[in-house]
Amino acid sequence: MFFASCENELDNYSAPNGGIKGTILDAETNEPIPLPVQGSTGVIINMWEQNTDATKSVDFYAKMDGTYENSQMFNCDYKIVVNGPFVSTCEDIVTIKGQTTHDLKATPYARINASAQVSGKTITINYSVTPSNSSYTVSEVYGYWNFAPGIDNGSANQAGKQTVKATEGTITFDLSNNANYTSNLYKIKSNGNKLYVRIGAKTEGKINYSKILEVTVQ
């Protein structure tokens, strides 16, 4: 992570004196936009200092629930740029003065509703995918399950995945004879038999996600 001071030259040796946090909200629904896992598949927040000599941005990952936070920023004006699974680049100007809260607005390619039920070791996910524009095409829908709450389309962030074409329907995981489930049973039991599921949808080449759902298997 790169820090550039907005203060005078002597202040370049000071610690950052501000910070920022907020939520990336759906411009239509005003709900947080669910995002991929923080890491190689994640959404990066780029903070560009304004009216300074800084030549690099301060970069950090947004969280899966659509929030973002960096408590180590210098006080000054920034342009925020977020290249996520949004119809257009999410960007804004913000003045950081101390610990600052600033929400952003963006439009996802699709909005996804999902719910999950469990019967024994069978997980059933009911879902619906609605493109944010009627001209957009949903090419694939994904159902995932994982041992940990970090879930997205990255192979390291899922224990199981199904791909379907329907924009509304049901995806079922029968884990009774699933190799990933049985070989990691100790891990699952140590977490109170909790698993995590999620739906993703590829629309116009970009993947949006549902919220992450926690379930308990028997």
Residue map of PLM features:
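Bacterial Sec-dependent N-terminal signal peptides
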Residues: 1-29
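Structured interaction patches on ligand/partner-binding surfaces of diverse proteins
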Residues: 84-109
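Short Pro-Gly-centered beta-turn/loop motif in secreted/extracellular proteins
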Residues: 60-64, 69-77
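Short, ordered, surface-exposed loop/turn motifs in non-cytosolic proteins
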Residues: 29-53, 136-141
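Short, acidic Ser/Thr/Gly-rich low-complexity loop/linker segments typical of extracellular
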Residues: 49-65
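Short strand-edge motifs at loop-to-beta-strand transitions and within beta-strands
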Residues: 66-68, 100-102, 167-175, 184
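Beta-strand-rich modules
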Residues: 175-209, 218
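Conserved structural position at the C-terminal beta-strand
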Residues: 82-84, 201
